Amino acid sequence: MNSSIVSQHFFISLKSSLDLQCWKSSSPSSISMGEFKGIHDKLQILKLPLTMSDRGLSKISCSLSLQTEKLRYDNDDNDDLELHEELIPKHIALIMDGNRRWAKAKGLEVYEGHKLIIPKLKEICDISSKLGIQVITAFAFSTENWKRSKEEVDFLMQLFEEFFNEFLRFGVRVSVIGCKSNLPMTLQKCIALTEETTKGNKGLHLVIALNYGGYYDILQATKSIVNKAMNGLLDVEDINKNLFEQELESKCPNPDLLIRTGGEQRVSNFLLWQLAYTEFYFTNTLFPDFGEKDLKKAILNFQQRHRRFGGHTY
């Protein structure tokens, strides 16, 4: 039986067995919160009239859980997004995409979209702190973004200076990863002052990836290890995963959840090593429109997944 026929029969049987009234056809289009919560538990005991291995059923179950924007909740009120406190991701990586498209859609200059980075990140930090999230790593400017027009790059560099001045007294700890030496000197000074001033802040840690790329991070870590080995500071036999991670610029646990706004579904050279076992969530919402409801939806989606880290929990 080919995979498309198996999937079709699977969803028909699932609809009947679980009494999912919102499924009008053989594939899920909209599902209520209450219906979604118990699906995975019921899948384990569901008897389907299919000739399929347990592994095949698990694959379809996983495929179902990985739907992001395709599973639409019937009620979008924030209060109805019941998050489990014990399953809140400790570290969220954030690709803030869609600022330029947001501005263009409103007939504005692209700079107007970029300007919203500061208030929007403040909002996300405030919500994240209340939810118990410990770290937010936000992708602000990549090593490839230098290819943009000089006017846009100059505007962004000035905007980042304003950003760090704003976050001096916002109450969160701020640190920067990326190649700072290539940034304007005035921006480097703003970064140094903000990192020093906020290093003692408790609670949320906001990491800004600025002139950062995953390739760059892996290469600089490799060069550092090679240099130490050549100077007799470590033996080649001592090189392992833990040692390598100590040389990466991110000095905190790897992200549990990656959120990318703006509809694109790729990581764009962001935290390539660190995202090995991170759960991905992609949303069509443009970053300037991304708010509390959207963040909670992403976290709820994360909480409904089975994180196996290469193992098997079924």
UniProtKB/Swiss-Prot annotation:
* Any matching Pfam family: Prenyltransf
* The protein's required cofactors: Mg(2+)
Quote the transit peptide annotation as a residue range: 1-61
CDD domains linked to this entry = Cis_IPPS
Query: Carries keyword Iron?
Result: no
Does the record bear Cell membrane in its keywords?
no
Which SUPFAM superfamilies does the entry mention? Answer: Undecaprenyl diphosphate synthase
Q: Which GO terms describe its biological process?
A: plastid membrane organization; polyprenol biosynthetic process; response to cold
One GO cellular component term of this record is: chloroplast
Origin, by domain of life?
A: Eukaryota
User: GO molecular function terms here?
Assistant: dimethylallylcistransferase activity; magnesium ion binding; prenyltransferase activity
Q: Tell me how activity varies with pH.
A: Optimum pH is 8.0-8.5.
* Tissues/organs with expression: Expressed in stems. Expressed in petiolules. Expressed at low levels in leaf trichomes, old leaf and roots.
Query: What PROSITE patterns does the entry give?
Result: UPP_SYNTHASE
What is annotated as the active site?
Answer: 97
Q: Which catalytic reaction applies to this protein?
A: 3 isopentenyl diphosphate + dimethylallyl diphosphate = nerylneryl diphosphate + 3 diphosphate; isopentenyl diphosphate + dimethylallyl diphosphate = neryl diphosphate + diphosphate; neryl diphosphate + isopentenyl diphosphate = (2Z,6Z)-farnesyl diphosphate + diphosphate; (2Z,6Z)-farnesyl diphosphate + isopentenyl diphosphate = nerylneryl diphosphate + diphosphate
Q: Which PANTHER family match?
A: DEHYDRODOLICHYL DIPHOSPHATE SYNTHASE FAMILY MEMBER, NERYLNERYL DIPHOSPHATE SYNTHASE CPT2, CHLOROPLASTIC
User: What function does this protein fulfil?
Assistant: Uses dimethylallyl diphosphate and isopentenyl diphosphate to catalyze the cis-prenyl chain elongation and produce the 20 carbon product nerylneryl diphosphate.
Q: Which family does it belong to?
A: Belongs to the UPP synthase family.
Task: State the protein's name.
Answer: Nerylneryl diphosphate synthase CPT2, chloroplastic
